[in-house]
Amino acid sequence: MNIKDHIRGVPDFPKPGILFYDISTLLAHPDAWQVAMGRMAREIIKFQPDVLAGIDSRGFLVAAPLALKLGCGFVMLRKKGKLPGETIRHDYALEYGTDTIEIQKGAIEEGKRVVILDDLLATGGTMAAGVELLRKIGAHVTGAGTIIDLAFLPGKQRLKELDVPFTCLASYDE
């Protein structure tokens, strides 16, 4: 099964000139979603994770079912102000400003092996921020994964510079 057959391209979203790759169509087809999660599980297990960290919000859709399949813990990396209780944060630069990603204090024990997951890798800014946050709390980031990689953007290179191996199911060159 070709996973790309179940990913819809939406032109001019969220703004003109952008082609948005939408996993909603993949999620809507249980057979395709099952195949996708099985393939991801076979790749992610190679990173020997204790915990899977999903990036807000579509990363939750990838990390949570994989955590169940692999018998790992699951934690959420969220935008500022979305998690209850005490959090640890990491501020990072955007093209025009800054943003913040947070994790609940105590969500991951120091030294645990963590794989960070999202639906799509583009510039790698949010994924890199997640890696930095996880390292800040003492986690060992053993890998990263997404359903989609926009190979024409620098996300993979950014992860390579952070010494984080990366895997994906579908790569797009434009």
Swiss-Prot record:
It comes from the Bacteria. InterPro entries: Ade_phspho_trans, PRibTrfase_dom, PRTase-like, UPRTase/APRTase. The keyword Cell inner membrane does not apply. Keywords: Cytoplasm, Glycosyltransferase, Purine salvage, Transferase. It is an enzyme of class 2 (transferase). Its main location: cytoplasm. GO terms for cellular component: cytoplasm. It is found in: Cytoplasm. Pathway: Purine metabolism; AMP biosynthesis via salvage pathway; AMP from adenine: step 1/1. Its EC number is 2.4.2.7. The keyword Glycosyltransferase applies. GO terms for molecular function: adenine binding; adenine phosphoribosyltransferase activity; AMP binding. Catalyzes a salvage reaction resulting in the formation of AMP, that is energically less costly than de novo synthesis. NCBIfam families: apt, PRK02304.1-3, PRK02304.1-5. Belongs to the purine/pyrimidine phosphoribosyltransferase family. This is Adenine phosphoribosyltransferase. It comes from Paramagnetospirillum magneticum (strain ATCC 700264 / AMB-1) (Magnetospirillum magneticum).
